[in-house]
Design a protein with these regions (language model features):
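Hydrophobic faces of well-ordered beta-strands that scaffold small-molecule active sites
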Residues: 1, 22-24, 45-51, 71-73, ...
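Short, small-residue-enriched loops and turns at beta-alpha junctions
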Residues: 1-5, 28-31, 54-57, 77-87, ...
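Conserved N-terminal beta1-alpha1 strand-loop-helix module at the mouth
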Residues: 1-8, 60-66, 133-150
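Catalytic cores of alpha/beta
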Residues: 5-16, 54-66, 100, 104-106, ...
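Hydrophobic, well-structured mid-protein blocks that either form specific transmembrane helices
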Residues: 9-59
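Glycine-rich phosphate-binding active-site loops on the catalytic face of alpha/beta enzymes
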Residues: 17-31, 71-82, 121-145
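C-terminal helical cap(s) of enzyme catalytic domains, especially alpha/beta-barrels
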Residues: 36, 87, 94, 119-121, ...
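Active-site rim beta-loop-alpha module in soluble metabolic enzymes
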Residues: 53-58, 62-96
């Protein structure tokens, strides 16, 4: 789910069903984030803020202030299809989010060759659906991801 309202109710459902993380879209009111986060804490889970569309670093500071530790930095499928690449503006925003204290899951057409771009970012996860699903040899691509991650972050 990408929750925009009813944070408490949907968090109870998600964490009650065994989820570890629940995503709240960045356009949600702060009250939705607070209520979802309260349930996440009680249930041993975490909230991720999906950064899609309009958001500010002040928003990110407010989420972090109430205890949110994660955000998803998303390059949309349409943006990627139109030729948008990861650029300095993206990397600067990700670095600023990292400096606030947020861990980032990065998604949007990520390939193993992209990973060095994110070396200075506090990365929690890479969401790499298209790179794997569209590959002729998905296990080989997965291994390339693992190798690059190990080489860059030592994990």
């Amino acid at each position: 789910w990408k929750v925009a309202d009813a944070g408490e109710t949907l968090a109870e459902q998600a964490f009650g069903a065994g989820a570890n993380w629940m995503t709240i879209i960045c356009a949600a009111p702060l009250a939705t984030v607070e209520r979802g986060h309260e349930v996440a804490l009680r249930r041993g889970g975490e909230i991720q803020m999906e950064l899609f569309g309009h958001w500010t670093l002040d928003d990110a500071r407010a989420w972090h202030h109430i205890g949110v530790k994660q955000a998803i930095y998303h390059r949309g499928r349409d943006a990627q299809a139109s030729g948008q690449q990861w650029d300095e503006a993206d990397l600067a925003k990700m670095k600023a989010l990292s400096d606030i204290g947020l861990q980032l899951s990065i998604t949007g057409g990520i390939t193993p060759a992209d990973l060095p771009l994110f070396k200075q970012i506090n990365v929690k996860a890479f969401i790499a659906g298209r790179a794997l699903a569209g590959a002729a040899n998905p296990p080989q691509v997965a291994q390339a991801f693992h190798s690059h991650i190990r080489d860059i972050w030592g994990a």
